Amino acid sequence: MGILAKIEQPRDLKGLTYPELEQLAQEIRAEMIDVVSANGGHLAPNLGVVELTLALHRVFDSPKDKIIWDVGHQSYVHKLVTGRQKEFKSLRLYKGLSGFPKRCESPHDCFETGHSSTSISAAVGFAKARDLRKEKNQVVAVIGDGAMTGGMAFEALNHAGHTKTNMIVVLNDNEMAIAQNVGAMSSYLNRLRTDPRYDRSKDEIENLLKRIPGIGSKMAKAAEKAKDSLKYLLVPGLLFEEMGFTYLGPVNGHDQIALEQVFEQAKMVKEPVLVHVLTQKGRGYEPSEKNPALFHGVGPFNKVTGEVIKKPAPPTYTQVFGEALCELAEKDPRITAITAAMPSGTGLNLFAQKFPDRFFDVGIAEQHAVTFSAALAFGGMKPVVSIYSTFYQRAYDQVLHDVCLPHANVVMAIDRAGVVGDDGPTHHGVFDISFLRVIPNLVFMAPKDENELRHMLYTSLQLDGPVALRYPRSVGQGVELTEELRELPVGKAEILQEGKDITLIGVGPMVYTCLAAAVELRHRGVEATVINLRYINPLDRESILRYARMTKRIITVEDHMLAGGMGSAVMEVLGDEGLTDVVVERLGYDEYVDQGAISLLHQGYGLSVVGILKAAERLKVLQRIEGRSSV
């Protein structure tokens, strides 16, 4: 039996020797490689924080002490040592262990994360609650250098520093080299700054100098300047010191002893402390060390070779979007592309290679990305800002106030719209229709397939004013990509087939599910109209009303929440016209959606052929069809 199998709770780590900890770190890395190679997941970030996580759980007392993981994708080690080893093989699977901290999973997951830059704000909140309740415990936020680019992180640092909140921020820096500054001088300065005698003597000397008649005040100022000069020379964390934090580090994030020592030092300080830890992303697995970006978030792979397992499939919507944008940018030098730290994930890496001067990666700063794009538009450019649906939530005010209200010519590409699979509820893009369709002058489209996506992108760049374009994470339908691009009439749906008995309205790829269901309905003697809505705003009210009056029964199908979604929009149209004799069944989500394969999630919520047939049965169009049809 290995050491890992004996670790049931963090307290079991405290009695281990350092050689045993080294062996445990190897076992943890092997377990993570084994599971992630089968399930996919965030491998490189977790390989880089093994020693850091062990040190945190040896020095601090979770769950009494609060450890908050920013983003949360680097919490696998934390899960393994907090009683979840037996469930670890279910990581990111349907009904399995989440890839992010979940309060319902363990008391050691004190705060749920998934989006970046939130941990320091949460830590300030926990610390203030502790102080108000007169409790005694430590609060630690662990944040990566990437997440530190988010403005919210600095808002929280400013608050914590200003209020002198007793808390610890661990900056996990996997971009900076473990170099000479991790040495004697750094260790000496760390000890000096955490020694209470240093603070006392500093004040005493300053007061003594000020008492010297005539020149005392000037001498004190000179000493202060000399101290500041030394800090500029020797202290890498001056920015954090100026914000009110005691800075400790940088520390080798793979040196178990050094990590534990610096955390013990941090516990001595009764004001905000930032511990700067240098780690190697992907450590301990050669393919990941060589290509940490690939293994940041990776699908199933061959753990021996590190090769990602790919099945033959059509290109993804993201790939088609990126290639189409490059094609259009070749002909129009005004087209620019903006992303918030997701060049590969949004398909803009190709644009970045071809047009580096017109490509902008602004970091994890969605708010800035959107407002920056608005000003680019007013400056005469044609910006296309591509952000995942779930992250557009963070920039809603900028979309409304800076883009739409002044009618800026900005194309907002909404990637990962709909459920995204294994990353679960923090990453599903199932709210964008609700919060965007209410904006009066925003043209809002959704393509049924990858070819229509190309035409919609082309159309977007011809329009005057803001445009949003939503498309899913998945592969395309495998349709032919037509070479000549054309404008699609704004606000006009596509009627794919007409039938007198029922109307199926789909948005995005759900249109193909509607078409497949229409075939099954025809086999049962029911003729269905199938509408590809195309435009969520403005709606094709004319077509909706025409077929509502004709069939009297409508089923709407959307990869989105029901509340405020496309189905709600259709019902609003019917209500405005007083069509009380038309019955509508809406298919979509009415709760937070769990993690799992996209197809499995769709089936579970009725976004399938069977789901549509059952909805038709509820509308009394069909006799019972249970068990008589396959998805």
Swiss-Prot record:
Thiamine diphosphate binds at residues 73, 114-116, 146-147, 174, 285, 366. Its cofactor is Mg(2+); thiamine diphosphate. GO terms for molecular function: 1-deoxy-D-xylulose-5-phosphate synthase activity; magnesium ion binding; thiamine pyrophosphate binding. Keywords: Isoprene biosynthesis, Magnesium, Metal-binding, Thiamine biosynthesis, Thiamine pyrophosphate, Transferase. One of its GO terms (biological process) is terpenoid biosynthetic process. Mg(2+) binds at residues 145, 174. Binds 1 Mg(2+) ion per subunit. Binds 1 thiamine pyrophosphate per subunit. It is an enzyme of class 2 (transferase). InterPro entries: Dxylulose-5-P_synthase (IPR005477), THDP-binding (IPR029061), Transketo_C/PFOR_II (IPR009014), Transketolase-like_Pyr-bd (IPR005475), Transketolase_BS (IPR020826), Transketolase_C (IPR033248), Transketolase_CS (IPR049557). It catalyses: D-glyceraldehyde 3-phosphate + pyruvate + H(+) = 1-deoxy-D-xylulose 5-phosphate + CO2. Homodimer. Belongs to the transketolase family. DXPS subfamily. This is 1-deoxy-D-xylulose-5-phosphate synthase.
